[in-house]
């Protein structure tokens, strides 16, 4: 008899759990697993403060040490999803690993936006920029397709156990990044410098890295540097709960307004 594919569901709680997310999790856990799948310790959660890099790193460690799961499904607590969408994402990961080499991550799509609601929603996908470590937001993409990208946000993705183990073997947190919370440490390092221009340059670099390489992009940079590939299924859309529920319809309306002279592709 074929062994089931074992799945662990992981979540990081930075402050609070959104009600849309709570309802999604309840519906998921109240249902049985599809044929060919089994839970590996069910839900693994990590409570953390604003340091998401630390929380996500602990989640990978708990996944490896506390479960025998083949994959870890990471869905942030401000996402809304259905059980069907959850298992379709897992199934996409499983099939992608069978059909392609070196697939480490498969993700769905969610969007980021400021206020008001249609203030330029952007998908959580990036392609490689001109230089290593630089990324360009992917604004438009083929609908309902599996595409390869350079980086994704960590809001909804499936990570292979071998990816987590790779970083555990190196004893590093792959989500670690330079952030503004590191300024006190940075100030200690440069306190002895007497060149104001050098100090200003270093501070600007720290802010740039914090803006451009948060914990999710830092993670993806290390994943691809290790030889793993990152795929996204653009048909799997996860609404992002802000002060409103930001979904694919909002994104498509914004794209059509942004490019009114182009034929709609989404």
Predicted regions and their residues:
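Active-site nucleotide-sugar/metal-binding loop of Leloir-type enzymes
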Residues: 57-71
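Short, high-confidence coil segments that cap the C-terminus of an alpha-helix
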Residues: 68-69, 98-103, 228
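Conserved donor sugar-nucleotide recognition element shared by glycan-biosynthetic enzymes
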Residues: 52-56, 216
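Conserved catalytic core of nucleotide-sugar-dependent glycosyltransferases
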Residues: 82-196
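Short beta-strand-to-loop acidic/aromatic patch adjacent to the donor-nucleotide binding site
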Residues: 69-80
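C-terminal catalytic/acceptor-binding lobe
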Residues: 2, 171-266
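N-proximal low-complexity "stem/linker" segments adjacent to membrane-targeting elements
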Residues: 1-50
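Alpha-helical elements of Rossmann-like donor-binding domains used by nucleotide-donor carbohydrate transfer enzymes
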Residues: 24-27, 58, 88, 218
């Amino acid at each position: 008899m074929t062994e089931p594919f074992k799945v662990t569901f992981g979540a990081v709680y930075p402050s609070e759990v959104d009600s849309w997310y709570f309802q999604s999790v309840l519906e998921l856990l109240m249902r049985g697993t599809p044929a060919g799948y089994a839970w590996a310790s069910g839900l693994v959660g990590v409570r953390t403060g604003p340091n998401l890099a630390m929380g996500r790193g602990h989640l990978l460690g708990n996944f490896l040490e506390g479960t025998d799961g083949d994959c870890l499904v990471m869905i942030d607590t401000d996402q809304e999803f259905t059980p069907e969408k959850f298992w379709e994402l897992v199934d996409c990961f499983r099939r992608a690993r069978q059909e392609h080499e070196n697939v480490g991550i498969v993700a769905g799509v969610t969007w980021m936006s400021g206020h008001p609601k249609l203030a330029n929603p952007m998908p959580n996908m990036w392609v490689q920029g001109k230089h290593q470590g630089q990324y360009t937001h992917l604004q438009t993409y083929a609908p309902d397709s599996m595409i390869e990208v350079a980086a994704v946000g960590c809001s909804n993705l499936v990570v292979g156990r071998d990816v987590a183990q790779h970083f555990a073997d190196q004893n590093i947190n792959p989500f670690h990044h330079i952030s503004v919370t590191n300024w006190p440490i940075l100030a200690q390092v440069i306190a002895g410098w007497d060149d104001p221009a050098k100090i200003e340059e270093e501070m600007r670099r720290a802010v740039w890295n914090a803006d451009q390489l948060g914990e999710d992009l830092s993670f993806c940079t290390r994943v691809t540097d290790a030889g793993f590939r990152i795929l996204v299924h653009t048909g799997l859309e996860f609404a992002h709960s802000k002060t409103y529920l930001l979904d694919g319809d909002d994104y498509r309306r914004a794209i059509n307004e942004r490019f009114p002279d182009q034929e709609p592709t989404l």
